[in-house]
Amino acid sequence: MASSRRGLLLLLLLTAHLGPSEAQHWSHGWYPGGKRALSSAQDPQNALRPPGRALDTAAGSPVQTAHGLPSDALAPLDDSMPWEGRTTAQWSLHRKRHLARTLLTAAREPRPAPPSSNKV
């Protein structure tokens, strides 16, 4: 019985996501901090590109787009990100594993006897 409770608790811990979600709700739009601007175009990806830079035209070929980027934009990313910059999903999984290990090891240890209530 105790092992089934422990298994159920472990299953709940691993499936429940306690951390904040990284997805942005559809109503917040594409602008940081809130709703879409009223003057924004229906397709925000094409609205952000300068004229002649749409990918479906000859002027917006991938080669020209790559030349329009800053020189370090195509450089390989280094793995020197500080721990604060990593995704919260990775850290919440780490926390879940730590909590599960703590609960499992605490369940294996014998519990001390409760204090007697027969004090005279």
From Swiss-Prot:
It comes from the Eukaryota. PANTHER family: GONADOLIBERIN (PTHR10522), PROGONADOLIBERIN-2 (PTHR10522:SF6). It is found in: Secreted. PROSITE patterns: GNRH. The gene is GNRH2. Keywords: Amidation, Cleavage on pair of basic residues, Hormone, Secreted, Signal. One of its GO terms (cellular component) is extracellular space. InterPro entries: GnRH, Gonadoliberin. The modification Glycine amide is found at residue 33. Stimulates the secretion of gonadotropins; it stimulates the secretion of both luteinizing and follicle-stimulating hormones. Residues 23-81 are annotated as: Disordered. GO terms for biological process: signal transduction. Belongs to the GnRH family. It holds the Pfam family GnRH. It comes from Homo sapiens. Residues 1-23 form the signal peptide. GO terms for molecular function: gonadotropin hormone-releasing hormone activity; gonadotropin-releasing hormone receptor binding; hormone activity. This is Progonadoliberin-2. Its main location: secreted. Midbrain; expressed at significantly higher levels outside the brain (up to 30-fold), particularly in the kidney, bone marrow and prostate.
